[in-house]
């Protein structure tokens, strides 16, 4: 377990634990405030993220930024965003179980350094890996569950919302619940 962000990111960028390293342009380590008390976890980088080296910078990321801004959150101020896998799966497919396992240590180390009070899983893959393997995201999104002293919630992935705009109001409700929970716990570092 590495004890500081710079060492962890440097080590992660040298990772060759699975085949995804063969086709990556960049390791997409994570973005945000390393003192945040809320961590959003996605599944893995897409093409734009791989090219730029930052999570959620494509169309889905732009929509995520709108959702965040609507509840007074921002990727540079009061949250941190990594992914389950740090390298892009080919053709934007879901990361395979062995790829997730090869990469999960990086996320665990990020989690240990951040020590968030709330973890939000963006989409099915992250929710299945971190909350429970049989989660039904379309039914269980927006519900908080405590696991090892951390409140966890799944929400619909921003890319899924772009494909199914009728689900946007439900996702927005999830973000409102998150904001309310953050205010209850006093865990918004931007507010004090």
Regions from the language model: what does each represent?
Residues 1-192:
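A polyanion-binding, active-site-adjacent surface
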């Amino acid at each position: 377990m590495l004890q500081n962000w710079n060492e962890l990111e440097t080590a992660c960028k040298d990772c060759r634990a699975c085949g995804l390293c063969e086709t990556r342009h960049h390791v997409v380590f994570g973005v945000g405030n390393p003192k945040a008390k809320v961590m959003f976890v996605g599944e893995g980088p897409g093409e734009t993220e791989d090219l730029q080296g930052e999570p959620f910078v494509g169309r889905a990321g732009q929509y995520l930024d709108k959702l965040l801004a609507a509840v007074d959150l921002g990727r540079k101020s009061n949250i941190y965003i990594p992914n389950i896998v740090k390298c892009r799966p080919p053709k934007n497919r879901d990361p395979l179980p062995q790829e997730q396992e090869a990469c999960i240590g990086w996320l665990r180390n990020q989690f240990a350094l951040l020590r968030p009070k709330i973890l939000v899983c963006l989409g099915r893959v992250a929710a299945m890996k971190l909350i429970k393997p049989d989660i039904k995201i379309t039914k269980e999104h927006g519900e908080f569950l405590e696991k090892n002293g951390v409140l966890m919630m799944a929400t619909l992935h921003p890319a899924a919302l772009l494909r199914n705009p009728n689900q946007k109001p439900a996702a927005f409700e999830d973000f409102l619940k998150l904001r309310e929970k953050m205010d209850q716990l006093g865990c918004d570092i931007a507010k004090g």
